[in-house]
Amino acid sequence: MRRFLKRLFLGFAGLLLILAAGGWLWLHPGRGPREDVDPAAKGWSEEVDGTLVVHLKGTPYEMGYQRGHFAREKVLLTVARFEGMLDRAKKEVGLPKFAANLILDITYQLCSPYIPDRYKREMEGLADATGCDLQMIRRGSVISVITERGCSAFAIWGGATTDGTLYHGRNFDWILDAGLEDSAILAVYEPEGLIPFASAGYAGMIGVLSGMNREHVTISQIGAVTSDRSLRGLPLEFVLRRMLEECPDLDEATRLIKSVKNTVGFNYVVSDGKAPDARAYETTANHVAVFGPDDPKETVEYAIRIPDAVFRADEAMDPTVRSLQRCAKAPDLPYGSISYDHRYKGIGTRVKEQYGKIDAAAALEILKATAMVDTNLHAVLTDGTNLKMWVAHAKNGQDASKQHFVEYDLKTLFLRPEDRPPVTAPAQVPAPEAPAEAAPAEGHTPPVS
């Protein structure tokens, strides 16, 4: 009997070791081969008005390697700031760092089947160029699946603007005091076989948060906490990137958002300056609702319908999606929430008041006035008609809405500086001196959960 029990114990211990080894291998998946890349053969970098701009071109691995080469210090800073956020989670909610890493590793593996291989290869190139831990880069790519954020976005055109130009404003309101803004860059992509685009974001993250492609399509997103969520799906940053890379118009954007496996609650505003037109997409893990300008489907009493305008904060207009939400006072009406009163209604009221008189400067004022205080990490205004972007990032703990907006012209941005036509007149930068008053932050830093 003693010998039997000993064998049983050894067998059980062996099984545990096998399971542990299998678990470790599952959480640390393999990768593709390293490649020899000359980053300067296709890629390059420049500084525009104090912002690092990296130009990435070629295969996924090449573009990742180019990003890592030209923005190495900022990539390392992104990873360091991300590590700091995990340390902060331990201090604020008692979540040990190893547990936070484990949660992110599991999340990545659950999302992995839905993440295109080209993005995995790009992350590998980024890690190889910088010496960063690939596992940390992977963790950063799924942070949107387990954190919350409050943002806002609007698209206006036609009768709403002075000359029909389509303006698209986007406030990215998240964690301001983690220092992520110190790693801000503009990435200009020319991926093989896909649509070129420009993305305002952070050096160590290959996903997209804000940007516009050369087909005049601008993307934006708003966090909308829901009970209908899943860890299995395509993370937000890659949904937005696929929109820019794959979608030349709104029909394709709608097809994409309906076909991907979504994870948690997000609202999107996507515009096409060629049309001009825009759509709002309200999504949960299992639902997608699509709305256009002045949409008769917006029957909820708190909806603000305006011709030639699409805008969103957290609250959904679709009754089913709204019934699943856990934000903006859900399941009650959103009145009194900062999301509704300051962001959604704030946009709608200002567009109505200035209807037909909105130019770039006025659109920027609407953007700044509806930003959140102490959480406005970056803010972007695009002129989708003329392929222009204005981008501001937070600085020294101060909101992006209070900073200088840097202008980019996508008609010439993809050219090397020596190939660009000379500028014959000063660019119109819509940056009024007096900062607009914004709302206080709603809640504290979202924990990793």
Walk through the language-model features, giving the residues of each:
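N-terminal type II signal-anchor transmembrane helix
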Residues: 2-33
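Mixed-charge, polar/low-complexity N-terminal
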Residues: 5, 100, 192-194, 198-200, ...
